[in-house]
Design a protein with these regions (language model features):
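Structural signal for hydrophobic packing residues in well-ordered secondary-structure cores
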Residues: 46, 63-74, 92, 96-100, ...
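A generic structural-conservation signal
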Residues: 54-55, 152, 222, 383, ...
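Glycine-rich cofactor/substrate-binding loops
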Residues: 2-37, 98-99, 280-459
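A helix-coil-helix interface module used to build multimeric assemblies
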Residues: 1-202, 207-213, 275-276, 287, ...
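Conserved hydrophobic residue
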Residues: 50-51, 75, 264-265, 380, ...
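Short runs of predominantly hydrophobic/aromatic residues within well-ordered alpha helices
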Residues: 38, 85, 89, 235-238, ...
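Short, well-ordered beta-strand elements within core beta-sheets of diverse protein domains
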Residues: 41-51, 164-167, 236-244, 369-378
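Charged, flexible cofactor/metal-binding loops and thiol motifs
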Residues: 122, 129, 144, 152, ...
Length: 459
């Protein structure tokens, strides 16, 4: 067992206690962050005269060797060590001798792991944001090509009003755009360096915390050492943002699953993103979308788990906080994987434009426009609403859309109707009349696409 404590103990740690307490199986993810943090720390120690330049160079050379060997697979991280910090320090001492024993001067594992986690999450926020960008690009590509692809818009999963595929996709662009903005907010808010906070009360060494923060790309040091070692707000914020990403993906997945069904046939998922059945030869299943929908729960669980872990912890560091890793790591991996797969599925998906338009025509999505026609001819809206309701009932009985109802039938219910009712309730007219900002008409949607393109250029 390699651990960083033991001098005041008279007995060996029980093996079950050691295994229960150890974190090497999961915090080994931090090996690169831990080593880079140590390099910055010893550079600062030398600047402050706490270490000699020769000691600094010896330690940094040793740390770089460990980093290179782990990356190449030459050096394996094993459960011989309690955690990633003891792994790095023990291997450093083996390589450079007594100089390695000075690495931990002016530092505690409390501020060390707080730094490692911040460096790691900072990297993951940037990686997540890159994957969000891929989603936005895939969505924008669909929008550009479908400004006049008509389809039904839904409320209560029932056909409501005609829109375009571009308009529908634009709603998802807005969702993932907000996800991108959240990544920027999280990065900005978390970008302070806890190193130098010590166990909780700083250190008596003359550390230059601002210098260390600058070396590691932070905006500056944390301003309270107790908060520095015990803050996990940024991780909770990140998990909350991941949960919202997964919620957006899950909603999108649900629609893809529905649209892909034989009952809708709005889309066909590419073979590369579909699976089959072990017994039913005809099946082509939307398993990727279903799994994304299913995996959303485990990301929610990570957020809830960390909130519950942190809710009763007194200042400053407590061992409970070791539980801030496994579930969040899983949530991060899950969300990134889902984003990557979903973007690929979108890029290869076939949209059945004719089927969408036909569905819009046969769902009375133009009923509101028929009522508006009457209003424009002087009929009070409430009366117009009732008149069109009668027309819908008549069409249901005849099993035809409003577009196919003869004019004489219109006139039987209201003499206000004239031949121009058919133009007024055509899909093209219904959509194009909706030309305010954010509506599905070609003009506002082209403006939206142009705006989104500019947004992506500045991403």
């Amino acid at each position: 067992m390699a651990q960083l404590w033991g001098g005041r103990f008279t007995k060996e740690t029980d093996q079950l206690v050691y295994k229960f307490n150890a974190s090497i199986s999961f915090d080994q993810r931090f090996y690169e962050q831990d080593i880079k943090g140590s390099m910055a720390h010893v550079t600062m120690l030398a600047k402050q005269g706490i270490l000699t330049d020769a000691e600094k160079e010896t330690i940094i050379t040793g740390l770089q060797g460990i980093l290179d060997d782990v990356k190449s697979g030459k050096l394996e991280i094993t459960d011989k060590y309690e955690d990633i910090h003891s792994f790095v320090e023990a291997n450093l001492i083996d390589r450079v001798g007594d100089a390695g024993k000075k690495l931990h001067t002016g530092r505690s594992r409390n501020d060390q792991v707080a730094l490692d986690m911040k460096l790691y999450i900072r990297d993951e926020v940037q990686e997540t944001d890159t994957l969000i960008k891929e989603m936005l690009e895939a969505i924008l590509g669909i929008m550009e090509n479908n400004l006049e692809t008509y389809m039904p818009g839904f409320t209560h999963l029932q056909k409501a009003q005609p829109i375009t595929l571009a308009h529908h996709m634009g709603a998802y662009f807005e969702m993932f755009k907000r996800d991108h903005e959240r990544m920027k907010d999280i990065y900005a808010r978390m970008n302070t360096c806890p190193l130098g906070s010590g166990a909780l009360a700083g250190t008596t060494y003359p550390l230059d915390r601002a210098y260390t923060a600058k070396l590691l790309g932070f905006d500056g040091p944390t301003m309270n050492s107790m908060d520095g070692v015990s803050d996990r707000d940024y991780l909770i914020e990140y998990l909350s943002a991941l949960s919202m990403i997964m919620m957006h993906l899950s909603r999108f997945s649900e629609e893809v699953i529905i649209w892909n069904s034989n009952e809708y046939k709005f889309v066909e998922i590419d073979d590369a993103y579909s699976t089959g059945s072990s017994i039913m030869p005809q099946k082509k299943n939307p398993d990727i979308a279903e799994l994304v929908r299913g995996k959303t729960g485990r990301v929610y669980a990570a957020l809830t788990g960390l909130l519950v872990t942190m809710k009763g912890i007194p200042l400053a560091y407590n061992k409970d906080m070791q539980e801030d890793k496994e579930l969040p790591f899983d949530a991060i991996d899950t969300t990134k994987g889902c984003l990557q797969l979903f973007a690929g599925m979108l890029r290869t998906m076939t949209f059945k434009n004719d089927r969408m338009e036909e569905s819009a025509k046969h769902g009375f999505t133009n009923a509101t426009d028929a009522a508006d026609y009457l209003v424009n001819h002087g009929v009070p809206f409430r009366d117009a609403h009732g008149i069109v309701g009668q027309l819908v009932l008549l069409c249901l009985d005849k099993k035809i859309p409003l577009d196919d109802l003869p004019l004489e039938e219109y006139k039987k219910i209201s003499p206000v109707f004239e031949e121009d009712i058919y133009e007024a309730i055509s899909l093209k007219t219904c959509v194009e009349k909706r030309n305010t900002t954010g509506a599905p008409g070609v003009k506002p949607m082209q403006e939206a696409v142009d705006s989104y393109k500019k947004y992506m250029e500045d991403y």
